[in-house]
């Protein structure tokens, strides 16, 4: 992930009213979710001091007797030094396409079979964003919405991306790991083009940046964003698209198409 931009962002770990419903404080449930991150070898994006600067990592071990975990270090020594000196790491991951977010403090750099790792106490709480009421549709490659970002000060040309999943609350795109266009909690004006029309002028806020590994081994970055501004009728247009794709998929499964 990005190791360059070090601009401060809002501390998105502070649970707002929307996230409070998804806050996990029960020790048994918290350990279970952390254990699942290990078992599923989930990629984690660790933001140093909750800022834009981040590195990809993974949970290696969970010591439930001493309430400590072991986090893999970065291949870049500069990131390891920054993490060692940081007050905390703000970590984002996914479990079965559901966002997991937690903060690690009191990091201690250790050697793990010749590789850098970090030992840290288990977090006191963890956000598990099970927003099932916002049904997310994984979009078909041949029938996907497109997201266009206009030219800006930091880029001379407009940027067009395929939307990989969408709901009534937001959408996601994937970009190369070295893409520095998106920053946490930053707002972006954009145009969302639905296959059925219309083109919607919207504003998006970046909620998470997650590393992912494709089946061919190539690493990419998934950018999850929520709708901050939708034009009148925009929500209905998005729901119509979701309904059409979902209906077509069910018809194919039933042999009707």
UniProtKB/Swiss-Prot annotation:
<dbReference type="GO" id="GO:0071973">
    <property type="term" value="P:bacterial-type flagellum-dependent cell motility"/>
</dbReference>
<dbReference type="InterPro" id="IPR023787">
    <property type="entry name" value="T3SS_YcgR"/>
</dbReference>
<dbReference type="Pfam" id="PF07317">
    <property type="entry name" value="PilZN"/>
</dbReference>
<dbReference type="GO" id="GO:0035438">
    <property type="term" value="F:cyclic-di-GMP binding"/>
</dbReference>
<comment type="function">
    <text>Acts as a flagellar brake, regulating swimming and swarming in a bis-(3'-5') cyclic diguanylic acid (c-di-GMP)-dependent manner. Binds 1 c-di-GMP dimer per subunit. Increasing levels of c-di-GMP lead to decreased motility.</text>
</comment>
<dbReference type="InterPro" id="IPR009875">
    <property type="entry name" value="PilZ_domain"/>
</dbReference>
<keyword id="KW-0973">c-di-GMP</keyword>
<comment type="subunit">
    <text>Monomer. Interacts with the flagellar basal bodies.</text>
</comment>
<dbReference type="Pfam" id="PF07238">
    <property type="entry name" value="PilZ"/>
</dbReference>
<dbReference type="InterPro" id="IPR009926">
    <property type="entry name" value="T3SS_YcgR_PilZN"/>
</dbReference>
<dbReference type="GO" id="GO:0071945">
    <property type="term" value="P:regulation of bacterial-type flagellum-dependent cell motility by regulation of motor speed"/>
</dbReference>
<dbReference type="InterPro" id="IPR012349">
    <property type="entry name" value="Split_barrel_FMN-bd"/>
</dbReference>
<comment type="similarity">
    <text>Belongs to the YcgR family.</text>
</comment>
<keyword id="KW-0975">Bacterial flagellum</keyword>
<feature type="domain" description="PilZ">
    <location>
        <begin position="130"/>
        <end position="244"/>
    </location>
</feature>
<protein>
    <recommendedName>
        <fullName>Flagellar brake protein YcgR</fullName>
    </recommendedName>
</protein>
<dbReference type="GO" id="GO:0009425">
    <property type="term" value="C:bacterial-type flagellum basal body"/>
</dbReference>
<keyword id="KW-0547">Nucleotide-binding</keyword>
């Amino acid at each position: 992930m990005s190791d360059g931009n070090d601009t401060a962002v809002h501390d998105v770990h502070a649970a707002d009213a929307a996230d409070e419903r998804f806050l996990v404080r029960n020790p048994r449930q918290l350990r279970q979710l952390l254990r699942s991150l290990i078992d599923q070898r989930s990629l984690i994006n660790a933001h140093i001091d909750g800022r834009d600067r981040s590195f990809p990592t993974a949970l290696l071990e969970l010591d439930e007797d001493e309430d400590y975990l072991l986090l893999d270090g970065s291949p870049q020594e500069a990131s390891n030094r920054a993490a060692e000196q940081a007050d905390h790491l703000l970590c984002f991951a996914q479990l079965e396409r559901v966002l997991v977010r937690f903060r690690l403090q009191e990091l201690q750099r250790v050697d793990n079979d010749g590789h850098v790792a970090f030992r840290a106490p288990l977090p006191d709480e963890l956000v598990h964003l099970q927003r099932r009421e916002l049904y997310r549709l994984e979009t078909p490659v041949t029938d996907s919405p497109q997201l266009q970002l206009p030219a800006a000060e930091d880029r001379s040309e407009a940027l067009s991306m395929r939307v990989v999943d969408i709901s009534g609350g937001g959408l996601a795109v994937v970009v190369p790991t070295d893409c520095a266009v998106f920053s946490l909690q930053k707002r972006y004006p954009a145009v969302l083009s639905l296959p059925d029309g219309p083109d919607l002028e919207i504003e998006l806020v970046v909620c998470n940046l997650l590393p992912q590994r494709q089946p061919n081994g190539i690493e990419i970055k998934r950018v999850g964003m929520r709708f901050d501004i939708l034009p009148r009728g925009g929500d209905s247009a998005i729901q119509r698209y979701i309904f059409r794709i979902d209906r077509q998929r069910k018809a194919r499964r039933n042999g009707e198409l």
